[in-house]
């Protein structure tokens, strides 16, 4: 699995390469590799605008790109960014301004597979800053709720795509 994240301007920096590695580790888990032996998947991501949740957008875009390319997946992925503000407030899908002022930022990647309790399973998580265990659990719950909306968006997008193809 190869992911190339191209910044909006200039050459890729160290932080861009770290983002690429995190996207690869999340997306690789979703690909059904036994059906694609000795195959390399390459996803090219071009940053158009960074509203603050670039990494989550990259994971979600990669998942949709693989789905659109008819790559067999074990599950779909939904990535959500949550920040803890200096005041202790939780925000999902923060802007870049909110992200820069946050005490901690957390990225959660969920699979469409459900756990025993019926919710999506956590594939990976990344944290920047300090967060208490209680705040981590609250952030996870908020991200879980947001991931359900992302999976619903996937369903409607795929249904629209197939209805257009069937009518053509």
Protein language model annotation of sequence segments:
Residues 1-168:
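Polyanion-binding surfaces on beta-sheet-dominated domains and ring/shell assemblies
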């Amino acid at each position: 699995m190869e992911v190339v994240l191209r910044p909006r301007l200039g050459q890729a920096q160290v932080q861009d390469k770290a983002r690429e590695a995190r996207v690869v580790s999340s997306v690789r888990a979703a690909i059904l590799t036994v059906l694609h032996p000795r195959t390399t998947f390459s996803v090219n991501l071009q940053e158009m605008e960074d509203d603050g949740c670039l990494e989550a957008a990259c994971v979600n875009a990669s998942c949709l790109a693989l789905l659109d390319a008819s790559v067999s997946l074990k599950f779909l992925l939904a990535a959500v960014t949550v920040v803890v503000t200096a005041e202790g407030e939780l925000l999902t899908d923060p802007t870049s301004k909110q992200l820069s002022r946050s005490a901690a930022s957390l990225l959660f990647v969920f699979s469409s597979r459900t756990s025993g309790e019926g919710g999506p399973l956590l594939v990976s998580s990344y944290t920047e800053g300090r967060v208490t265990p209680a705040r981590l659990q609250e952030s996870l719950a908020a991200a879980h709720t947001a991931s359900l909306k992302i999976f619903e968006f996937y369903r409607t997008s795929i249904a629209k795509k197939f209805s257009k193809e069937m009518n053509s």
